[in-house]
Amino acid sequence: MPLFDEGEFLSPYGLRALSAYHRDHPYVLDVEGQESTIDYEPAESTTAMFGGNSNWRGPIWFPLNYLIVTTLEHYYQFFGDELTIEYPTGSGRKLNFDQITSDLRDRLISIFLVGPDGRRPCYGWVDKLQHDPAWQDNLLFNEYYHGDNAAGLGASHQTGWTGVIADLIRRRWGTVPSLGDVMADIGLMPARGTAAPSTPAPSTPAPAAQEDK
């Protein structure tokens, strides 16, 4: 399945908007002698078309990923553990849709986490953002992320669509009491591949009984 092929759509940080296959094999459409070409562009667009945005031509774009993840969640609600597919493609490993969505969420969350090299992928190679105490823990929500290394690209204030990372964290690590606490605690999140915490989510106290009047 191309969607879960690490040589096509599946990157270490989520799903690409366009298959990396087209890096070396551009798609060419001929319409009455006029050729139009699209290739894999993991970072900023190579043309000024659409203002130079390349959201849907290769980068990791959160609206697309969020729709796919939530759709796979619904598939699991219907199929349960009975249906498994190979993930990643070519790995020989069969997973159900719940396991696949968990891994996809982990990949997306890892964009913002400090990795083994001491860097947050989302800050790319901008030293000030990576190491300056005034910046390093104040995360930005970029418009989209490099399809291969997850460096943040485009506008850095997309608190609408990229902000859905908060809900993905809540869905993956259900112990977070509220979305308001999510981003403050993101630096403490376990690295991808570790087990979810076992501490139960705080329960909501029952309302106090009212006296009869």
Model-derived segments and their meaning:
Residues 1-213:
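Acidic, mature catalytic/reactive cores of soluble proteins
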